[in-house]
């Protein structure tokens, strides 16, 4: 009898702990998106990067969809996300981001063909998913989000004019973005700098890192499939 009571008490305590933990998670997800979004983004990015098998790829697709929905729902929800530029873009810039991504991929493809450079073959599905969703989100939140804000704030405090500060920030971040891609040299490095400038221009014009991430995602997705043409 005493053993049964002990088991019941243990069960009640476990349920209470689980309920408290679930409440903490719910509170973090809803009230602290500036904490949950980066953690969830890194988690999805890591899962997708190794999702070679079909079952793992299916899980990666599901998590990616959840990430995109959550990322959209928390646009501009907290002051920290506002600093990162994770907000809805100016009117019309969702569409402009897609068009700019298409134009950028076509431009890079044309440059590569002109110089008889290969863009490689079509990557495996998990790499395409990574390059067209969590990858661009992660890179844009870091480069056109956090670093863009830091460099721009530094130049602004040095009393640099807004136009000059924005222009310099775009170029500096683009160069850093290009050199962060290990192994890129020559034409590949220069085109990465150019696309980084294009992503930065979209960030500045739309006033949204999310718009730059969408442009980046479209660029990667299209380039993945036209690389062999």
Predicted regions, residues:
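Short secondary-structure boundary micro-motifs
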Residues: 54-57, 66-70, 117-120, 160-161, ...
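Transmembrane helix-loop-helix hairpins at the membrane interface
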Residues: 125-229
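Alpha-helical transmembrane spans of integral membrane proteins, capturing the lipid-embedded, hydrophobic core
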Residues: 32-35, 39, 43, 61, ...
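Phenylalanine-focused residue identity feature
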Residues: 12, 21, 36, 40-43, ...
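Juxtamembrane helix-loop-helix connectors linking adjacent transmembrane helices
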Residues: 51-54, 75-142, 149-160
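Generic signature of intrinsically disordered, low-complexity segments enriched in small/polar residues
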Residues: 15, 24, 39, 43, ...
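Membrane-interface helix caps and helix-loop-helix hairpins in membrane proteins
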Residues: 49-55, 117-118, 179-187
